[in-house]
A protein has these predicted regions:
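Internal low-complexity, small-residue/proline-rich segments
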Residues: 1-253
Length: 253
């Protein structure tokens, strides 16, 4: 059912509440637990937080839509294997870090950003619908009309007004166990620490690595190496590093 109707099985509530230090970046002073009201009848739950996000791929085309197979590692019912990393394991991002939500939802005038936008998601489902097949359909709200492919997120930012950091568990990194994209997934659409905010629609969206480290964010690659992706990385290169089978020629980064 809809994300807001999904609640923890009582047996697993202690696990949902658990704070796991290895899932938290020491440089992020954000909350380590969040409260969210879910289900019908509504109940309040506590979630342990998370800084490390698995990649759904480049975010280009329809590869932001984790309901279907993507050019990354993770999607609903994903069955990606190491042999599917045709771009090479050392050239493919598997996970990257993010900044946890600040636990304060706000509604602001269109085009206005909150004081710390990197701690919130721009909740931009207005003007979109699931449509058929991979990818969502736009009909307003700054989104292109028709299938949403490679959208101009600044146009979306200019129209949308809702910023989320915890409502219904819908904040960045508010849980490590609830499998919603804005909580546990990332993609390469936005470069590290981009001034374009992480933008979500219907539980999925357009994200990017974020950290409070100076100059960039860390990423885990398919070969197990951890490398620092600079804020200044070329956007095309960044997206290529997040795809596992795009056939791109990737130089030094």
């Amino acid at each position: 059912g809809p994300g807001g109707s999904q609640v923890p099985n009582p047996v697993f509530i202690p696990a949902f509440q658990a704070v796991i230090p290895s899932f938290l970046c020491p440089s992020d002073p954000g909350p380590v637990q969040y409260m969210a009201t879910l289900g019908s009848p509504a109940q309040t739950y506590i979630f342990g937080a998370n800084n490390y996000m698995a990649s759904t791929g480049s975010g280009t085309g329809t590869n932001y839509d984790d309901r279907s197979s993507t050019d990354g590692f993770v999607a609903i019912n994903s069955s990606v294997r190491f042999k599917d990393m045709r771009d090479g394991s050392s050239q493919t991002v598997f996970m990257s870090e993010a900044i946890r939500g600040d636990d304060a939802d706000v509604t602001l005038p269109a085009g206005t950003t909150p004081l710390f936008p990197y701690r919130k998601l721009l909740s931009a489902g207005s003007g979109t619908s699931p449509g058929s097949g991979p990818g969502y359909t736009g009909s307003g709200g700054g989104w292109p009309t028709g299938k949403i492919i490679n959208p101009d997120l600044l146009a979306v930012l200019a129209v949308q007004t809702n910023w989320r950091a915890t409502a219904g568990g819908n904040g960045r990194g508010v849980t490590w166990l609830r499998g919603l994209a804005h909580s546990v997934l990332t993609n390469g659409y936005n470069t590290p620490n981009s001034r374009i905010p992480d933008t979500t629609l219907h539980g999925t969206g357009f994200f990017g690595p974020r950290s409070l480290h100076a100059g960039g964010a860390h990423a885990l690659f398919g070969d197990g190496s951890v490398r620092f992706l600079a804020d200044s990385i070329d956007v095309g290169l960044h997206r290529a590093l997040h795809s596992r089978d795009g056939g791109e020629t990737v130089g030094e980064f």
